[in-house]
């Protein structure tokens, strides 16, 4: 039998509402985080609108902070942001998914300022943001937002993803965007790919590092980042649309001899019922594969492709 001094729900209930209220007031006088949590609970009694107001104010306050967060304050900050996430999902989302979606998006966007002024090497804050991101797609579907607005928001967030807070966003938004939205998003990134990155005059170029190949210039690194961003976005959109040829188009010809790239292409061709083309894609990388190395996906996809063509007896050949 548990002691009457054990901290559990049954024992606390024996104190009565008045005494518990007094104790909580004493606690919140010295604990700001507990105070904010109680404010959220009180706001929830008046409906999701009051909770939304409290959450919005807290997110704005966190976003405005500029002081560096010491390592011992990272966990409390993570708990604070997690409390806002839970309030959004538990008190707002069930009755007002559109408002919940807006607030959750703002919460995830906090990653940019927050991770800029703290050391999250243990991933404490990153886990909170990733948890919020994981339900964003379902919340967007429930909110039934206009497709054009959602396209613009996804585009802007993918482009402003310095800390990886929106990693995998296109995939998560596949359902709420729909085919039309995905194609509209693709057009935006295709237009971005056509943008010419202007190189500043040599005397104005900023050196950011040195390597065996020479000097690293800021504009060159930015151009490469731009190219990677666009290519990855178009790859994600191609996969979301099930457009194998669009995926292949994003794989440079000189990289298709890499067994890992060849396997990625072949796997998609196989899923599209194009087993013969999958074998051809794998064959293009066989020379490098035979030189050694560990290429489990190449082997796995080749076996599956041969089996699909009715050549299971050849699956282990070569």
Regions found by a protein language model. Name each.
Residues 1-318:
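Eukaryote-biased, non-catalytic alpha-solenoid scaffold regions
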């Amino acid at each position: 039998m548990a002691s009457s001094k054990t901290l559990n729900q049954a024992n606390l209930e024996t104190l009565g509402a008045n005494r518990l209220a007094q104790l909580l007031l004493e606690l919140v006088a010295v604990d700001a985080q507990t105070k904010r949590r109680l404010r959220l609970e009180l706001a929830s009694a008046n409906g999701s609108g009051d909770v939304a107001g409290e959450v919005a104010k807290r997110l704005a306050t966190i976003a405005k902070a500029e002081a560096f967060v010491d390592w011992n304050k990272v966990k409390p900050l993570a708990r604070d942001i997690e409390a806002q996430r839970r309030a959004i999902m538990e008190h707002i989302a069930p009755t007002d998914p559109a408002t919940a979606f807006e607030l959750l998006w703002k919460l995830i966007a906090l990653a940019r300022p927050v991770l800029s002024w703290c050391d999250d090497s243990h991933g404490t804050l990153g886990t909170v943001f990733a948890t919020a991101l994981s339900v964003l797609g379902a919340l967007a579907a429930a909110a039934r937002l206009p497709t054009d607005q959602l396209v613009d928001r996804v585009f802007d967030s993918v482009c402003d993803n310095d800390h990886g807070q929106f990693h995998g966003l296109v995939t998560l938004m596949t359902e709420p965007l729909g085919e039309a939205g995905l194609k509209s998003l693709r057009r935006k990134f295709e237009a971005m790919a056509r943008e010419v990155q202007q190189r500043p005059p040599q005397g104005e170029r900023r050196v950011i590092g040195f390597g065996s190949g020479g000097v690293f210039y800021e504009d060159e690194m930015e151009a490469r980042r731009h190219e990677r961003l666009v290519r990855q976005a178009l790859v994600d959109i191609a996969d979301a649309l099930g457009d194998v040829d669009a995926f292949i188009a994003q794989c440079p010809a000189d990289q298709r001899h890499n067994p890992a790239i060849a396997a990625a292409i072949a796997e998609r061709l196989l899923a599209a019922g194009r087993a013969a083309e999958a074998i051809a894609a794998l064959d293009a990388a066989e020379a490098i594969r035979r030189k050694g190395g560990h290429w489990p996906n190449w082997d796995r996809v080749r076996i599956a492709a041969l089996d699909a063509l009715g050549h299971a007896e050849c699956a282990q050949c070569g």
